[in-house]
């Protein structure tokens, strides 16, 4: 996440009496830079050195590699490629790879509450956070009731296999999420699949029959 990750890592670094340099994702450089600028302003207002947090400008792979090779500790948040690069940098590293937490909705739990909280989690920052409720597992006999609560809470649910297949093709290419759809609004994702959504749609729900390797939609998507 281009805002939460720099902020969270900075707070942990500061608590340990460390400075931190952020190497942002290229497509999110403006957002991360704005976040760092706000933190630097807050540091200055409180009489602390602004350079406790810095950011790499015009980031490139080469700059990131140089930074990893010369710092004291690497905290790598991203895909498997980034994590592998961090572990191969020669510098002690903590790596965080893809996340796609499944949420199990048990019988007897408040379906309205489950739907509302899941939508809050996934809609936050357009699903960029990889700890959102990306996969929901629910009792099959409660499907109709759960879907209804999901729709009331602001989701559009596609439960027809042909519709879901179009989203599958739109979201993934050669087994990987299309970068151009990461963190995009629901209407942008829907249009890529050939659909128009009602205004104000917070989350797109897709019914799948398999989990894990049985359906690629069970992978990390990073979108609402």
PLM regions: where:
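Glycine-rich phosphate-binding loop
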Residues: 74-86
């Amino acid at each position: 996440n281009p805002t939460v990750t720099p902020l969270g890592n900075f707070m942990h670094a500061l608590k340990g009496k460390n400075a931190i340099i952020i190497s942002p994702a290229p497509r999110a450089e403006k957002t991360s830079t704005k976040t760092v600028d706000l933190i630097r302003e807050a540091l200055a207002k409180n009489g602390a050195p602004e350079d406790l947090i810095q950011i790499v400008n015009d980031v490139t792979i080469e700059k990131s590699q140089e930074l990893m090779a010369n710092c004291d500790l690497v905290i790598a948040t991203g895909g498997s490629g980034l994590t592998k690069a961090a572990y191969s940098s020669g510098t002690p590293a903590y790596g965080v790879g893809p996340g796609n937490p499944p949420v199990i909705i048990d019988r007897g739990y408040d379906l309205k509450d489950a739907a509302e909280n899941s939508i809050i989690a996934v809609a936050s920052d357009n699903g960029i956070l990889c700890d959102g409720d990306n996969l929901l597992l629910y009792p099959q006999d409660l499907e109709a009731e759960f879907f209804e609560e999901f729709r009331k809470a602001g989701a559009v649910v596609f439960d027809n296999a042909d519709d879901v297949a179009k989203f599958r093709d739109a979201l993934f290419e050669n087994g990987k999420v299309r970068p151009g759809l990461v963190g995009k609004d629901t209407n942008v994702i829907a249009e890529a699949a050939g659909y128009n959504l009602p205004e104000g749609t917070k989350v797109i729900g897709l019914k799948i029959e398999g989990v894990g390797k049985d359906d690629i939609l069970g992978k990390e998507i990073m979108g609402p």
